[in-house]
Regions:
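Short, solvent-exposed turn/loop segments enriched in Gly/Ser/Thr/Pro and often Arg
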Residues: 3, 13-16, 40-41, 167-168
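Active-site cores that bind ATP or allylic diphosphates and position pyrophosphate for catalysis
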Residues: 27-168
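A glycine-rich helix N-cap at a beta->alpha junction
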Residues: 1-9
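Conserved short loop/turn motifs at secondary-structure junctions
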Residues: 8-17, 141-143
Length: 168
């Protein structure tokens, strides 16, 4: 099974799976687990600096989370620059890593993460969650540099109702 030999779980290149990602982005948007964010780079930097000044770890403030549907529709029709953010619930994310053992993260420290540039252009943490589910991946082996991505991926899996693979 793979891109060179094919198989039942195929389309293996992310560029060939855009409609699959769109389906799941649309699901999260419909369920209000994700939302359009129209914040500019300057606004995000101002918010970041304000948090640092207050001695807080910088994270997205969530200000676009409560935009009215009508406002979002107008901004999208106007072609306003945007991304799609996943609403991170305030919870502890706990999982068992097959190498490191039990790991726990405080999701409230993360802030809402960007999962797509638009419904058909997913970013890494979203795309791998969908790919793992659609391709029936049971074990995710990753480097230490991706350990911090795991709680984000687990929260996205839970929001989509996907089973959680084993991590190592």
């Amino acid at each position: 099974e793979g891109p060179d030999i094919g198989g039942s779980l195929g389309r293996y290149r992310q560029s060939e799976r855009l409609e699959i990602y769109k389906k799941y982005v649309d699901q999260l948007l419909k369920e209000k687990r994700a939302y359009y964010c129209f914040c500019t780079k300057d606004e995000l930097e101002q918010d970041r600096q304000a948090m640092l000044t207050q001695g807080l770890a910088p994270k997205y403030s969530g200000k676009c989370r409560s935009l009215e549907d009508g406002t979002v529709t107008i901004q999208l029709k106007n072609g306003d620059s945007h991304v799609i953010r996943f609403h991170i619930p305030e919870a502890r994310v706990e999982f068992k890593d097959l190498i490191r053992g039990s790991i726990s993260f405080d999701a409230a420290l993360m802030g809402d993460i960007v999962i797509a540039k638009d419904p058909t252009v997913p970013l890494y943490n979203f795309a791998v969650v969908v790919d793992d589910y659609e391709m029936e991946i049971s074990h995710v082996i990753r480097g230490e540099d991706h350990l911090a991505n795991t709680p984000k991926q687990i929260l996205i899996q839970a929001a989509l109702g996907f089973p959680q693979p084993e991590y190592a």
